[in-house]
Amino acid sequence: MLDINLFREEKGGNPEIVRESQRRRGASVEIVDEIIKLDKEWRQRQFELEQLRKDFNRINKEVAKLRISGGDASSLIKNTEENKDSTAKKQAEVQEARTALYSKLETVGNLVHDSVPVSNDEADNAVVRTWGERREETNLKNHVELVELLGIADLKKGANVAGGRGYYLKGDGVRLNQALINFGLDFLEKRKYTALQTPFFMRKDIMGKCAQLAQFDEELYKVTGEGDDKYLIATAEQPLCAYHIDDWIHPNELPLRYAGYSSCFRKEAGSHGRDTLGIFRVHQFEKVEQFCLTKPSGNDSWEMHEEMIKNSEEFYQMLKLPYQVVSIVSGALNDAAAKKYDLEAWFPASKTYRELVSCSNCTDYQSRKLEIRCGQKKGNEQAKQYCHLLNSTLTATERTLCCILENYQTEKGVAIPEVLQPFMGGKTFLDFLKKIKK
């Protein structure tokens, strides 16, 4: 959520900055004026409420004086009762006006950083850099075929039990998946990240502070039972985001770096018909996530953003998977992101780059809703500063596994990346269990 003061010119704000950001996103510009109007209405109601409270205090003092002097205060007492009724109604108006304002404010995306390519077409994503030598042979097997040839997942039984996109990892598939998780956690620990295994579900009110409204329909599974409804997490970012809810964090403690590990659950309602085979796009997967908090001052969060994408790059370099890093166009940014990089790894069988990593700087957009503040607790609302929050995939392991299979395949099986071998009991190669059909 944006700072409401950005919309208040009399408070030093500049609504034109918000309008320009909305233009870059291909989103409504008119909403800025709607918010300004709603804000003025809310503040007017607040002013009227304060006047009623002042009147109440004034009348009460007059009643006290009359009682001391023995005068008749009955008419004034009647006025206080009328004032109480008016105040109660005005409080309801204030709350209604505030709800209308913030409901609208929450639909405006974060301010798009000036370095983001402006377009609504993802074909215009800017390639920042590439790494590695791509395999270009013909007749390579794709990850769906390789999973079957190796016997490392049972998709048929998975679909029978869990429905479409269901799967069982099996044998070396389990070991390879766990190897990626353990390698990822070791990798981040060496870079001063604190590991966190997150809850797999969240309360609705907390999830609402971490996820966009559209995600509730397209991504999130609802869990019902005793007590409040809960939602399964779609990414470790969501519970990591809420970890410091309502906290004051001293600047000397920043930056904070977390390595989140979790299973994730997605309905994938918006991707119907895409990648229905294999384990690339599934409803349940494991993830190791980078999540960082920085001071809001200077370029701290932007330097951290570059550090985080470099971490992800180094991870895939150690796996020896060719990739490109792209800067995502303004029209494809989610609401929270001011800027986002994707790391897309090379899948040689389909001869295309596919996204394995998303790395976003969300500045103070999420921390405002979550009240994650920087500094010492202050009574002055205007003096509050909010931490900047950043997130980046390190590995969504089933996707990374698919990429490894395609890049490390041979005629007889699949080689295991050298950095994963210590986590595989020293195993270096997976043999095909089925013969390749010529």
From Swiss-Prot:
Q: What is this protein called?
A: Serine--tRNA ligase
Entry keyword annotation includes ATP-binding: yes
Locate the residues binding L-serine.
235-237, 289, 393
**What are the EC numbers?**
6.1.1.11
**For binding ATP, which residues are annotated in this chain's numbering?**
266-268, 282, 355-358
Quaternary structure and partners: Homodimer. The tRNA molecule binds across the dimer.
> Which Gene3D superfamilies does its entry note?
Bira Bifunctional Protein, Domain 2, Serine-tRNA synthetase, tRNA binding domain
